[in-house]
Each structure stands twice: as C-alpha cells, then as structure tokens.
Design a protein with these regions (language model features):
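Short, non-transmembrane cytosolic segments of multipass membrane proteins
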Residues: 86-119
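A hydrophobic, helix-centered structural microdomain
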Residues: 134-202, 317-333
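A short, structured surface patch at a secondary-structure boundary
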Residues: 215-276, 317-325
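Short, glycine-/small-residue-enriched flexible loop/hinge segments at domain edges that mediate gating
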Residues: 40-63
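C-terminal terminal-structure detector
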Residues: 2, 273-333
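Short, glycine-rich, amphipathic interfacial segments at transmembrane boundaries or analogous
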Residues: 176-223, 281-298
C-alpha cells in the first residue's frame, strides 16, 4: 500500500515502511534546505527505515547547495543505520555526481531511461549545470590561461632563489600540496611553495584557531618558518597556484578554496560559495584577508563576488590585489 505524508516539505510516499522522497526539477539552495528538512523529519520518526528512496526522475538541475544537502543527509542516514538509495537519476545529475566523485559513494539504483554510459561519458561536460555565469565564460577562461602562463613564467624565474631559501631555512620539500574543494565541491590538489615546517598538517590540531566558524587562522602560527612568513607577506608562496589555474581547477579570481574539513562543517546555504571556481584572489583577498576572522564574513564576501561578477569586476579585483601586495598591512590567507 502506498500512502502520502502531506506535512513533509517534499512529497513523500510510503511503500510499506520504505519512504520515497520525490525531488523537484531544480535542487538549488531553497529546495536543498527543504530537502534536508524533509529527511530530518523522516529520521526523527519513532522508526528509522532501513532505506530511503530518493526519486530524481524530475530533477534536471543540481548545484552545490543540492550536493551539500545530499551529503548531509547521507551522513545522517549512515549514523542512523539507514541508507539513501537514488532512483531514476537523469544524465544531467549523474554528470554532477561523476564530477564530484559522489557516484563512488552513493547507492544509485538505476540510470534514467534511455541513458547509456557511453552517451553520458561523451556529453557530460555539456550536461554539467551552469551554476554561475562565470563558470561557462570563455573570455574569463582565456584570461585565466594567459594570466597563468605569465604567472608560471614569473614562477620559473623566481623558483631557484625561493627553493634555496626554503631549503636553507627548513630542509624538506620545496612545494606543499593540499586537498581543497573546488567548483561544486570537487576535490583537487592545490600547490604552494612550502611556508611551514614539514609536519605542519600533523601539528594543526595543536594550534589554537583564532577564527570563528569553518575557517582556520592563527596570527602567530608557530608552524610557519622564517622564510615562510616573508613569502606569505608577499604572497610568493602562492605562485605555484598558477598551475592550478592553467589546469582549470582554479581561476585567477574567485572564492577562497576551502579544505574538505571546513566544508564538512557547512550548513546547506553555505555551499553556495562553491557555485563558482575558487580563485587565487577575490573579495576576501582585497578586503583584509588576515583580518577576516568570522566565517560569516567569508560567506558574505564570496556571495558579494558572485552577485557582482563581471569580466570588468574580475579585472578590478586583480588590480586591487596588486595594490594590496604592496600594502604593509596585508597578510596571509
């Protein structure tokens, strides 16, 4: 017997004790919040179902907020001993799952009718959602490529003296790689010149966080080397990120690239900042990056960038960044 619960945020039907949540055509921030609320209502019941069916038959658009709600619900389901089963997922949504590697961890029952893996593979780039105009701007991408090539040329010139300074000050690797979250939450490896001691990541838990929310900051972080402080003051440590820009993982201008542990603490609306590519610079960089200590301020600046974005706005932020680099009050990200 199939029954319907009218009080749910989304339409929920039951077949026996197994609920099916019917998702809407679009799964962006407002719908994503409602999606999370709907699943919370199911999980707060007296009996936790062994599985929850998520019917994606109507859904053709999902952005980073939708991904955030799905990830959040998946974690709660596992904590409750339940499982989310995705049914009738359209190729557009499957392309997003493939981009973010969620197709590796989600239980997907079956593809949408008439969708085959070969077709999806060849057209997945065209099926990815346009979460923000900057994502599909070929002019912005051209500026990124030209800027990255120029930046890598400068990096090549400065590489030897920087490498020698790093090695003399604190022997170890020249480069530091760290997993960050890019567009739609996709993981990528960001590169910098190493500005901290070799075992910096292992020592992070021992350092006091002077910021509030899902960011980490400490003005006197003891892990930073002497040469590292100079590089951070001048942003020389970030020169290798031009490689990330050239690969398309980052942009010259965008939002601050968060770490996975930061993203794990996001509420659904905060995932909106992942609707654009992360950038080497952005609003947070030109508005006193070292003085931004509240995560809500980071969100505000990132959303301001998304709302005001244009090619001229990007160029304006690039020139502002150059000015900030010569400001003695600038600081490390």
């Amino acid at each position: 017997m199939v029954s319907q619960t009218p009080e749910a945020e989304f339409r929920v039907t039951y077949k026996g004790e197994i609920p099916s949540v019917h998702l809407p055509v679009r799964l962006s921030v407002l719908e994503a919040v409602a999606f999370k609320t709907t699943c919370q209502q199911i999980f707060s019941g007296t009996t936790i179902p062994s599985e929850i069916i998520l019917d994606f038959n109507q859904t053709t658009f999902i952005d980073s907020s939708g991904i955030g709600a799905l990830v959040s619900n998946m974690k709660v389901a596992r904590q409750k001993g339940s499982n989310l089963v995705l049914r009738r997922v359209n190729p557009q949504v499957m392309a997003v799952f493939a981009l973010t590697s969620l197709d590796q961890v989600l239980t997907i029952e079956q593809p949408a009718p008439n969708a085959n893996s070969t077709e999806t593979h060849h057209s997945k780039d065209h099926q990815l959602p346009i979460t923000h105009p900057s994502v599909r701007s070929w002019v912005k991408r051209l500026i990124d490529i030209v800027g990255a090539l120029v930046g890598l040329g400068i990096t090549g010139i400065l590489f030897l003296p920087i490498a020698i300074a790093i090695t003399i000050d604190n022997p170890g690797p020249i480069f530091f790689g760290q997993t960050r979250c890019g567009w739609m939450g996709k993981h990528f490896r960001i590169w910098k010149f190493r500005s901290m001691c070799v075992n910096a990541e292992a020592l992070k838990s021992q350092i006091k966080n002077q910021a509030s929310g899902a960011i980490f900051k400490n003005d006197n972080d003891p892990r930073i080397t002497r040469v590292g402080r100079i590089m951070r003051k001048t942003s020389l440590d970030e020169l290798p990120q031009f490689w990330n820009v050239l690969k398309g993982e980052m942009s010259l201008v965008g939002t601050r690239p968060p770490t996975p542990d930061e993203v794990e603490r996001y509420e659904v609306p905060q995932w909106q900042r992942l609707d654009v590519k992360p950038g080497m610079t952005g609003e947070w960089q030109v508005n006193g990056r070292s003085s931004v200590r509240d995560f809500e301020d980071v969100i505000r600046l990132d959303l301001k960038y998304q709302q005001n974005w244009s090619l001229m706005y990007d160029l304006k932020l690039i020139f502002k960044t150059i000015a900030v680099l010569f400001n003695k009050n600038s600081g490390a990200v």
